[in-house]
């Protein structure tokens, strides 16, 4: 039951950390690809 109660906060933390990191990484790769071309 504790895991179920903590799930929203865990999801928020995960999304708050992983999504910006993924967005920045994809943006960085996109810029690098455009620089080469």
Curated annotation (Swiss-Prot):
Its main location: plastid. The chain crosses the membrane at residues 9-29. GO terms for biological process: photosynthesis. Pfam families: PSI_8 (PF00796). This is Photosystem I reaction center subunit VIII. Belongs to the PsaI family. May help in the organization of the PsaL subunit. It comes from Pelargonium hortorum (Common geranium). GO terms for cellular component: chloroplast thylakoid membrane; photosystem I. It is a single-pass membrane protein. HAMAP family: PSI_PsaI. Keywords: Chloroplast, Membrane, Photosynthesis, Photosystem I, Plastid, Thylakoid, Transmembrane, Transmembrane helix. It is found in: Plastid, Chloroplast thylakoid membrane. The gene is psaI.
């Amino acid at each position: 039951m504790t895991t179920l109660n903590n799930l929203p906060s865990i999801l928020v933390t995960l999304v708050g950390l992983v999504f910006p990191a993924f967005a920045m990484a994809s943006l960085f790769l996109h810029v690098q690809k455009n620089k080469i071309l």
